[in-house]
Amino acid sequence: ISILRVLLKNFLIFFLSKLFSINKKINKEINLVDIFITSNNLSNDRYYKNFFLDKKLFYHVPTFVDLSLRKVASCLIHFNKRNYILKSQFLTFKDILYSIYFTFRVDKIKIKETFFKKLNIKDLILRELYLRRNLDASIIGIQNYLFAKNLKNKNIKLKSVLNWHENSAVDKGWNYG
């Protein structure tokens, strides 16, 4: 996926979220369930088998994966009727810019000589950073971190957070936040 496409997609999802979603009143203590939306068929939760869907104490926090903007808008309208919190409710435009600017900050990362079993892997690390693989996941991970940080700044206590903890950039943002 081209860098420009990833950046544009993140901007557009943020703006669609602001346009189509209702800011919900959130309790001061909440439970969050991290979910990935891969289609606009929202009647079947492929991760938790709808276990949390009707639980009033749990809020789903969706991340959109490989959806067209039309399908994202359709999902956003549906979320207004359910226990969903959108990250955009707690992220500012400045937060989105900061997460997207990661694309350019990565070039400024300085790597010291790094050895693994007497082999210098500095060039390998620099190459991986330069290729920007998983750029979208890195941006979403930063947004997840900022989302959690902003919840704390609004004095919202997280009683529990369920995420897949697959050690991906997306989950690391959740866990660090």
Enumerate the language-model features and the residues they cover.
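Catalytic-core helical/loop segments in enzymes performing group transfer/polymerization on anionic/lipid-linked
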Residues: 1-177
